[in-house]
Amino acid sequence: MAAAIGAGLPIAEPNGTMVIDIGAGSTDIVIISLGGINDIETVRCGGDDIDNKIVELVAEKYDVAIGIHDAESAKMEVGMVHCSEQLDNLSVEVIGKSLETNRPKKVVIDSMLVADAVEPFMQRIVDGLNIILERLSPELMMGVYNNSVAVGGSSRLRGIKERIFDEI
């Protein structure tokens, strides 16, 4: 509710507003109408799951263990939902621990790797969005279409809002 108010959405109106809150451990998709919560769908995935997937992919690809905070920093610095190799691929260097030698090893985490980590979770969020939209009354559909916001740390990933709102 606070996110909708902070975004200046018309929560007291009867037409409906939607807030997609991508938290650390879960994503809440909330429909607000007439100043109250009309419906909510919780998807059990969030930013922490993406960070853990980045750690896993770096270990698989480079045979290097990185810390969860390095994964989160890389996600926020170079992360995006879709990445075209020639135009969008950004990268960041991270020092991890070689799983082979147990020594420090520098790896490059790029936007492509982060996009690969994000995709399975994006699909779960989109599935949750589709579930709540199926339950949505026709009277609220236009308001939700016109008055929606995504919030939370991972909502700052490039392309995530476009991907979510393309589904509406």
Give each language-model segment a name.
Residues 1-20:
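Conserved phosphate-binding catalytic cores of ATP/NTP-utilizing and phosphoryl-transfer enzymes
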Residues 6-9, 30-33, 41, 55, ...:
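Short acidic, glycine/serine/threonine-rich loops at helix termini
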Residues 10, 117-144:
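Phosphate/ATP-binding catalytic cores across multiple sugar-kinase/actin-like superfamilies
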Residues 11, 22-26, 34-36, 142, ...:
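Short flexible coil/turn linkers enriched for glycine and charged/polar residues
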Residues 19-26, 32-36, 46-48, 152-154:
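A short acidic Gly-Thr/Ser loop motif
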Residues 33-119:
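Phosphate-binding glycine-rich/basic clefts of nucleotide- and phosphate-handling proteins
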Residues 142-164:
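Glycine-rich phosphate-binding loops at beta-strand->alpha-helix junctions
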